Amino acid sequence: RNPTPNYNLALDGGYPVVIAEKGYGTVMANFAKRKAEGKGAEIISMTGGLATNQIPSASVATLITDKPAELVASLQKAGADYAKRNGGNFEISAKADGKDVKLTVTGVSAHSSEPESGVNPVARMLDFINSLDGKVALKHNHITDAARYAADNGRLDYLGNKLNVGFSDAFMGP
């Protein structure tokens, strides 16, 4: 007879037997849509990811402006500087489409059980947007509110240490 192994049940597993799977947590923060205030470009939408247990490969924000070429140049420069300061293992690009500017952060997709194997573009998009304050003229709205909240409450810390919810044990690790 073998000793009983350490295990847990993973109800979302597609396999007949799952020895263990790291869980994940979700912080749900809601920001009331509000009219943009101030001068500059306005972020009108932001996307990233299809499932809560997935680190997506890209996050896209759409901005509107009267000066798309100028905004693209500013975002490209700020994006290159931001990527260099934050590990350089992701890319930030901006492209004009009429008066719209598509801002894309490309990271590395991963399952949430192994966040260290991915590069979360949503976290980087929010942190990047927040870092633009004073460098690139952006109107403040619910999306910039969300970016500030994310920067203040976790930034790029995927282990939850800044929120005081970080956990680790010998069997599962962090």
Task: Annotate the PLM regions.
Residues N2-P174:
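Midchain, well-structured core segments that form catalytic/ion-binding scaffolds
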